[in-house]
Structures are given as structure tokens and as C-alpha cells.
Design a protein with these regions (language model features):
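Glycine-rich P-loop/Walker A and Walker A-like loops and their local beta1-loop-alpha1 context
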Residues: 2-37
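Conserved catalytic loops of ABC-family nucleotide-binding domains
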Residues: 37, 130-158
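Walker B catalytic motif
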Residues: 91, 117-126
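A short, proline-enriched helix->beta-strand linker immediately N-terminal to the Walker B motif
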Residues: 109-116
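Catalytic "switch" loops of ABC-type ATPases
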Residues: 41-52, 154
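Conserved ABC ATPase signature
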Residues: 91-98
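Q-loop/switch helix immediately C-terminal to the Walker
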Residues: 47-82, 91
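Hydrophobic anchor residue at the start of the ABC signature
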Residues: 105
Length: 170
């Protein structure tokens, strides 16, 4: 049994605090666990979102989302996450890290992925974006019953009032 086998089981808004090296190791273990797992309710949110080269951004965001789901929830979710409609018309290389994260969160809501594992995006975000992200993540937990595991090295994030649980990575 690996030391981090329970990492894909978490509740509320949980922060896993550790160095970047520890995060990389844990993130690799989580990916490996998910590949061998039958869980379909988990999504990994990455700052360097891997895109399918043959899809445009809108197709990427709505991949595997039914038309019914898309039509019934898209506008409401875009509004909640403060995603401008012009964002979906951008080229992938025009997106900043915060836009990529918000689009992945929108996909997670539409795809009904209720467990999110988020790779540390903090170094690539402004203070305002970090504050907005924490509010969005807390809203996902409270409004959509999501469970979120955020890997970070930033102690101020771990001590945020939005965070329910904090664990040391080691």
C-alpha cells in the first residue's frame, strides 16, 4: 500500500500543503491511482490544461457534455464563475491560467464531476485571481456538494477561512 493511497478520498474543501517536489510526487501517485480506479466522479484541474489538438476551445470545454446539459446549465454556470462569453471564442494559447482553471471548473460542473483535484496554480495567479478562485471553490463545495483537494505550497491558502481541512503532504 502506498503512503498516499487515500488521497482520492477527501471531503469539503481540503488543502494538501507541501513543497513543490512533494506535490509532484503526490500528483503522480493520484494520476496513477485514478488510471487504475473505476471512479468516474473525479476530475483533475491543471494549470497547464492538456488540450486535444484537433478541438477548438469550445469543443474542449463541452467534450462529453450532452446538448441538454449544456443548454440547461451553461449560462448560469458561466455567470457564477464569471466567465465572459468571449472567452470561449479565444484560441487556447490566448488563455491565461485563471481562465483555463475556470473553464475546467465549468466542465466539471456540466460533467457532474463532484470530486476535484487541483494542481497548485497559485504562483501563476494574481492576488485578486487567488481570492476569486477561493470563492469559486468554496461555492462549488456549498452549492454543488463538490469535494475539492487543492495541492499547494502556500501556507496562506491553507489558512484561508474558505478551507475546511488542511493536511501536511509529508
Amino acid at each position: 500500500m502506498k503512503p498516499h493511497d487515500s488521497l482520492i478520498s477527501f471531503n469539503g474543501f481540503t488543502v494538501l500543503l507541501g513543497s513543490k517536489a512533494e506535490q509532484q510526487l503526490i500528483f503522480s501517485e493520484i494520476k496513477e491511482q485514478l488510471l487504475t480506479s473505476e471512479r468516474t466522479d473525479v476530475m483533475i484541474v491543471q494549470k497547464n490544461w492538456p488540450f486535444f489538438p484537433y478541438l477548438n476551445l469550445k469543443e474542449q470545454v463541452f467534450l462529453d457534455i450532452s446538448e441538454k446539459q449544456k443548454k440547461s446549465k451553461q449560462e448560469d454556470i458561466q455567470s457564477k464563475l464569471m466567465i465572459d462569453s468571449s472567452c470561449l471564442k479565444k484560441a487556447v494559447d490566448e488563455l491565461n491560467t485563471f481562465e483555463k482553471i475556470k473553464l475546467q471548473l465549468m466542465h466539471a460542473i456540466l460533467a457532474e464531476k463532484t470530486n476535484l483535484i487541483i494542481e497548485d496554480p497559485i504562483d501563476d495567479l494574481s492576488i485578486t485571481e487567488i481570492q476569486d478562485l477561493l470563492v469559486h471553490l468554496c461555492d462549488l463545495v456549498n452549492e454543488f456538494s463538490f469535494s475539492i483537494l487543492l495541492l499547494t505550497h502556500d501556507l496562506s491558502i491553507a489558512e484561508s477561512p474558505y478551507v475546511h481541512f488542511c493536511k501536511e503532504a509529508s
